[in-house]
């Protein structure tokens, strides 16, 4: 077990790598330039690294634990700069929090401790990097997925997601007719779905004042709708794109079946599904993080996130313990004021080094 001393000063190497990565745009699917920066960092530190068929940066080594985070970011230009913040210097720029801060911390710790590393692509769009990775290699002994949790936070759970497209067609007619048209059918189906999932999920916690937590609920969201008279004027057509977030008390099949059960007209083409995950806080890797965070003077926080991450894909494919961890405030994900406190980065690197030393 590592007895790491609390960080006493800036981690210059980590801060320089973070700035280099944030200065290099990597909006999916154009991550190549940033991947090259990452490969160069590993090679400069005498580690073998390569870019695989889909664009992931692979640096295989000790598989006692795999450190992985994503290279890509969402769009949005934020001038890269360092500002003095309330808690010291902050690096501003797109991706500084989501997820080049975690990516940097994991890469630095992987080089210093000799554990395996992968920087994946496409997390913000289709998780093509993570999907390829689980198909291309065996499970490691443990996984740390990099996303912002705060240097003292450990994320154990994510909801899954189901995506689909509702399609309905009805005969055209005068709007005074009482029969529902395709647009009304779409509205009726979606209203029924929202009502269906307004009640508690099986086994979810109930609070008399606030009800079940968001993490424990299915949350349906319409994301796009189109409707109107067809080009030939003979029909009313509607398409409705939807997403439903899935808590661990459901499977994605459960949610699809329940949503399909509310259909009275039209059909749903389900296009994607990612299962939820809830990891145990009692695994060796979770314990190693608690010890390492306390070693840096922190009070470990165990987190559950209402979104979905690449850890969902790893958990569905690999039978090994895992957590998600990384510096940064996740409230700044995708935000116009995205920035990372650099002392967060320093502490996260120290935590990750201690975890790797504990597990190897």
Please provide the spans of the model-predicted regions.
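Short glycine-aspartate micro-motif
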Residues: 66, 91, 141-145, 163-165, ...
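Metal-dependent amide/peptide-bond hydrolase catalytic core
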Residues: 157, 165-360
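Well-formed, non-transmembrane alpha-helical positions, independent of function
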Residues: 20, 132, 313-316
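Acidic/His- and Gly-rich active-site-bordering loop/insert found
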Residues: 2-99, 329
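Phosphate-handling active-site elements
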Residues: 85-89, 109-120, 139, 195-202, ...
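Acidic/histidine-rich catalytic neighborhood of metal-dependent amide-processing enzymes
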Residues: 104-163, 167
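Short, conserved micro-motifs enriched in small and acidic residues
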Residues: 92-104, 123-124, 180-183, 339-346
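Short glycine/proline-enriched coil/turn segments at helix->beta-strand junctions
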Residues: 43-47, 53-55, 60-65, 110-116, ...
